[in-house]
Amino acid sequence: IRQDIQDGNGYVICRENRVVAYGVVSFDGEPVYEQIKDQWSNDLPYLIVHRLAVADEMKRQGMAKQFMLQAEEVSRRKGIYNFRVDTKYDNAYMLRLIDSLNFNYCGEVYYRNNSARKAFEKTLRPHSNPIGVPGYTIREATYEDAGIIFEAIDKNRDDLRTWLPFVDSLQSVADEQQFLHPILATPYEKRDPVFILEHDTDICGLAGFHFSDPSNHRTE
C-alpha cells in the first residue's frame, strides 16, 4: 500500500474523514494481461483496479461499486475508455460486483504464485454533453464506435469527399479502427479527438478537432 501511494495510484473513499474503502487505480498496465493479449478488444491504454478493500462496517452498502464507478470517472477524465480487472475464481463477492458493472469475461491469467484468475474488460462510454438543441448531444468517439462511424461515412461518402480528402481510404470498419487507434493512444491533453453528434441514440454528425499543431487549430 505504501508503494501504491508513492506511485500516486492509491485511492480512498472517506466518510466523515475516515477511510472506508481503499483500492489501486492504475493506468500503468499489467504485465500478466499480455498472456491473453489477443482476447482483449484492443491494445489501447486501460484502467485497472487492484486491491479493493472495504471496511467491515461498510460492507454490503455499495461502497465497492461506488469505488469502481469513481475509478471510471477518473479514467474518463484521462480519455481512457478501457477498464480491465481480474479476480480469483473463489471471490464470489468480486465476481458479483464485476457482473453488476457489465464487464465481459476475456480469459484466464496467472500471477507469479501460479494462481489462476478470471480477467474481465468493459468499455467506458464517454459522457454525452448537450449542445443547446433539444435531443442533441456530443461525445468523444471510442474505438468501439468504429462500426457506426464507418456506416455513417459510407452512407455520405459523396458529400464528405469535398472536404475530407482521405474519406476514400476508409473502406472498412478495420480502416476506421486503424484511424481511431493512434488518436485514442495519444494522451488526452495532446490528442486531436473525434467527436460524435447524436440525436437520442442515433449518430447524426462527426467532428474532428485539431489541437496538437498550434498553427493549425481547425475543426472538420
Task: Show which residues each predicted segment covers.
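Hydrophobic adenine-recognition pocket in adenosine-nucleotide-binding enzymes
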Residues: 52-54, 87, 141
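Conserved acetyl-CoA-binding loop-helix of GNAT-fold acetyltransferases
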Residues: 54, 60-73, 96, 100
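Conserved beta-strand-loop-alpha-helix junction that forms the acyl-donor binding cleft
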Residues: 59, 85-95, 113
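Conserved GNAT acetyl-CoA-binding A-motif
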Residues: 68, 75-87
